[in-house]
């Protein structure tokens, strides 16, 4: 995998962010990454095929929600919280609170 393109902060569009967050699996990934940590793709557990999870990760990255980096053969992902907060103040906390209250995306976990 070559280095993926990430949109600059001012290129992050609200419509793309909201569309990306409308899927329960993608919202679950965001909930998992909300602790501020970075996770290897191999650590993510979701009720979808690996190829489908890879697609979800691309949608999140292309929307500007996550940042992916490659180290050797491993890929790591983290939430672009500061960029999202700069662009859309209070959006992410509101979405995370609502998702937590409704338990949306809870099936996405990290490997122990």
Q: Model segments located where?
A:
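Amphipathic alpha-helical dimerization/coiled-coil segments
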Residues: 1-13, 31, 35, 80-112
């Amino acid at each position: 995998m070559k280095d993926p393109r990430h949109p600059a902060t001012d290129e992050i569009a609200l419509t793309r962010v909201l569309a990306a967050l409308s899927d329960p699996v993608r919202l679950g990934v965001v909930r998992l990454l909300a602790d501020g940590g970075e996770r290897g793709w191999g650590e993510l557990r979701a009720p979808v095929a690996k190829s489908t999870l890879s697609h979800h990760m691309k949608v999140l990255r292309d929307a500007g929600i996550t940042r992916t980096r490659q180290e050797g053969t491993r890929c790591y992902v983290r939430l672009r919280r500061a960029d999202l907060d700069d662009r859309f103040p209070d959006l992410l906390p509101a979405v995370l609170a609502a998702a937590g209250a409704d338990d949306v995306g809870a099936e996405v976990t990290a490997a122990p």
